[in-house]
From Swiss-Prot:
It comes from Pseudomonas fluorescens (strain ATCC BAA-477 / NRRL B-23932 / Pf-5). Its main location: membrane. It is a peripheral membrane protein. The gene is lepA. This is Elongation factor 4. GO terms for molecular function: GTP binding; GTPase activity; guanosine tetraphosphate binding; ribosome binding; translation elongation factor activity.
Amino acid sequence: MSDLSHIRNFSIIAHIDHGKSTLADRFIQMCGGLAEREMEAQVLDSMDLERERGITIKAHSVTLYYKARDGITYQLNFIDTPGHVDFTYEVSRSLAACEGALLVVDAGQGVEAQSVANCYTAIEQGLEVMPVLNKIDLPQADPERVKEEIEKIIGIDATDAVTCSAKTGLGVDEVLERLVTTIPAPTGNIEDPLQALIIDSWFDNYLGVVSLVRVRHGRVKKGDKILVKSTGKIHLVDSVGVFNPKHTATTDLKAGEVGFIIAGIKDIHGAPVGDTLTLSSTPDVEVLPGFKRIQPQVYAGLFPVSSDDFEDFREALQKLTLNDSSLQYTPESSDALGFGFRCGFLGMLHMEIIQERLEREYDLDLITTAPTVIFELQLKNGETIYVDNPSKLPDLSAIEDMREPIVRANILVPQEHLGNVITLCIEKRGVQHDMLFLGSQVQVTYDLPMNEVVLDFFDRLKSTSRGYASLDYHFDRYQSANLVKLDVLINGEKVDALALIVHRDNAHYKGRALTEKMKELIPRQMFDVAIQAAIGGQIVARTTVKALRKNVLAKCYGGDVSRKRKLLEKQKAGKKRMKQVGNVEIPQEAFLAVLRLDS
């Protein structure tokens, strides 16, 4: 298939649960990519974790051959994208390799904030966006209202949007027909020198680095010598091929196609995502515009439970970073937890997923500290520094001004839940920026402190709106705020891993809530354990985990009171001595208590 006019590269944009992976399954089934017995739900969500949570985390690609009604067989390269707000980076990578995108919208629920954000990304990248209404078989489906919403909220013409039901397979052939006519063919020249963009790469223990690429110009085949532009290293191609959805080797990959290249690269960072590949004979090919490096929003410390695992942990992180380039990490050490890494994530879901992948795929036991965001500090000597770890905060006397990151949040919510959402935003110290009424939905824009958003905002937004509100946010600016560092002291000793940076107005409340929570989680010892929350030198809250005590008077039947007093005094002295030398083991749950403060 050397003719580019028969190739269509597209991806699907959709909100979580709008039926993206199911539609992909139907495409694979209709184009005969898998035998009946191999067909299973969510073929592309290959990670166990993706299946359990029912979300797509990684971008995947599939090449299908579809015989259209005009008798021509088209090669469809379909790149699956995640729908969750934490994985926008994966989406922008997938879109960079396509000429078009299907915007899949649930005909019952209507447009959600996340699809709006991803759709704008697609339009900015110059893609042809084709609306598809899914779940048309549901009783609550209302295609006319949803078409109107698409036009009002996103601003693309949806009057003749295709309707289908991915679950029953109704109308899916119509989607494929429309796709072939609407989405433009790729441009590129097979005769030009090779120029290919790495969309994704992952590490295979046997094959080395496997890279998913989109070839812009030229061709690449087994035995070619390829040059990685960013590292300048040359590798020999072992095999090229496509996923349909199984690994299938082909003779070559040509301009306009999407497939994989295996070149025996053993260095984990040998083929970074967003990089350009070319042949070693034409090293001066232009670098393709990659994707913008995305900045992590949330930081947390990850520590192996046993210090022997530290090296394995480092290696696991390196392999994960290859596959998920939005993860960043630097080594750190903590008095309470030993050596570990400070990792940067895109959001809380991303953090949970990474931790779970480390524990499952690499068999590690990890302790996570409470997540924090980056604060900007203006010091009295005129310096500006950025702090992502409360225990690294300089002395308050040296700080002129503390600024916290503010995010601009777009929330789409049905009118009947608007009041609850506004109350939640005000409680989270939000400032309303804008409000638009779009049919039965309302789009509210708030400026919220990121510190309040990362912990539990998403969950609480869903629960106050019965799951109907959807959220999309991006970093906006740093703004001065009255922030303080809240330390937790256990038996008079500061535990660095439990420190928090909070707003002064909430400090007393947070301190009280945190000490109460810790009291439930720290097991009782043989001596009293005092848990205190302090701001600077001032203690704002205290609770005590009461000691377990043996009844030393049990053996005195009657007898003299002085005998009893002697035994009690002796016990008291023992407890006092124990308290001076005793250590308190802090369980993992206690470190995460910070997350579960019902603010």
